[in-house]
Amino acid sequence: LSGLVGSEMCIRDRARRALAKAGLCGFEQRSYNMLSGGEQQRVQFARALAQVPNPVENGEARALFLDEPTASLDIGHQIAVLETARDFASGGGLVLAILHDLNLAAEFADQLIVMHGGRVTASGPSLETISDETIARVYGIGGVVGRLPSRHIPYVLPQSRHR
């Protein structure tokens, strides 16, 4: 709760709402050190949400910065975290998330910036940014970029698995 501004009751309410959005209802009294790695990761996500509970405040868009928010999470919690971030963006806020999983990034991001060696190597809408050429250039591996048939979202598979 440290770093939050407002009355104690307001701060506790913001913290409870953030924990609920992170799927941690009832965790308020649990010691952080006793949580699993995935639970600790979701606590970190809740901390970010508690800092900016509303995507727009006083007519100005707020920003939510997330560094690997899906690390250590099972797929169900990965999706829940990224859907919550997408809801924040849909409400008028800005979400800047660092992800290493291009498949998740393609599913949840409107725009992608792909970096390699600290430099931007590709950027733009995910449909245009994720390509065989980008995968080869950034990761030095052959990949097969396909499209999920129902939604035309790109996905990446190693070549050896796609034969």
Task: Provide a role label for each language-model segment.
Residues L1-G6:
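Single conserved hydrophobic/aromatic residue that forms the stacking wall/gate
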Residues R12-F27:
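Conserved ABC ATPase "signature" region
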Residues S31-L35, E39:
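Conserved ABC ATPase signature
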Residues N54-P55, Q78-G91:
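Helical segment within the ABC ATPase nucleotide-binding domain
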Residues E57-G59, L64-E68:
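Catalytic Walker B motif of ABC-type/P-loop ATPase nucleotide-binding domains
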Residues L99-H100:
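H-loop/switch region of ABC-family ATPase nucleotide-binding domains
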Residues D132, A136-R163:
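ABC ATPase nucleotide-binding domains
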